């Protein structure tokens, strides 16, 4: 069976987390590292925004700072994500890998099978819903909110009809980077306090809609699920979903050096994080 690399990194700063994902992508494109599945957490808890979001217009940056949270713009699309009581994953693999369909949506589906298996390993009755129809898209979408779990992807992972994972994908240098957030618990009021709304009424409507369409692992689990148990469940999930053997590893010195350079030149700069 084909071997992919499997890495669990210690909690890192928001800039470093995004820089590491990009460093793996770049060095994988150069053939220096194998396809990689990575799990990580954030220190401090962080609000990340999508590549195309307007930071100053959409985000209450003063509140982010007052709460002692980190802030970073991702290289992937999507909306705002609060990385707090959650596990973040990333999958980095060449576009031309035999397991990866050329279609963006189908590649997203293949990678997301790992998530599906992970939720099932935790004893949750998760399912993958195709959002091909406008009716399905509407069911999982909340127009007007900048929060990621309000926005539908092409395939949605749901438990009891509610979204349980938010993912985004980018393709650069012939490599796919898909990363996303697996929620263990969530402070919905905190998330929405970090976003701008035209009025309190609109904000409350978005919160109510969000609660109807998104859910966390520990809200639907019959027992408490820890971070470590989640890592084990999802690592097995990606191995079975992708039909590969995951070999535990660590970041190379070259990856770390490149990531530190990307922190300095991109992910820790206002030019990157506050643009648009």
From Swiss-Prot:
Short name of any one Pfam family annotated for the protein:
LplA-B_cat
Any one Gene Ontology BP term: lipoate biosynthetic process
Q: Is Transferase tagged as a keyword?
A: yes
What UniProt keywords apply to this chain's record, in alphabetical order?
Answer: Acyltransferase, Transferase
| Catalytic residues of the enzyme | 148 (acyl-thioester intermediate)
Annotated metabolic or biological route of this protein:
Protein modification; protein lipoylation via endogenous pathway; protein N(6)-(lipoyl)lysine from octanoyl-[acyl-carrier-protein]
Q: Which InterPro entries match?
A: aa-tRNA-synth_II/BPL/LPL, BPL_LPL_catalytic, LipM, Octanoyltrans_LipM/LipL
Q: What is its EC number?
A: 2.3.1.181
Reactions catalysed, as given in the entry: octanoyl-[ACP] + L-lysyl-[protein] = N(6)-octanoyl-L-lysyl-[protein] + holo-[ACP] + H(+)
Annotated ranges, domain BPL/LPL catalytic: 31-246
Known PANTHER family for this protein?
Answer: OCTANOYL-[GCVH]:PROTEIN N-OCTANOYLTRANSFERASE (PTHR43679:SF2), OCTANOYLTRANSFERASE LIPM-RELATED (PTHR43679)
Q: Which HAMAP family match?
A: LipM (MF_02118)
Other facts noted in the record for this chain = In the reaction, the free carboxyl group of octanoic acid is attached via an amide linkage to the epsilon-amino group of a specific lysine residue of lipoyl domains of lipoate-dependent enzymes. The reaction proceeds via an octanoyl-thioester enzyme intermediate.
Q: Which family does it belong to?
A: Belongs to the octanoyltransferase LipM family.
Name assigned to this protein = Octanoyltransferase LipM
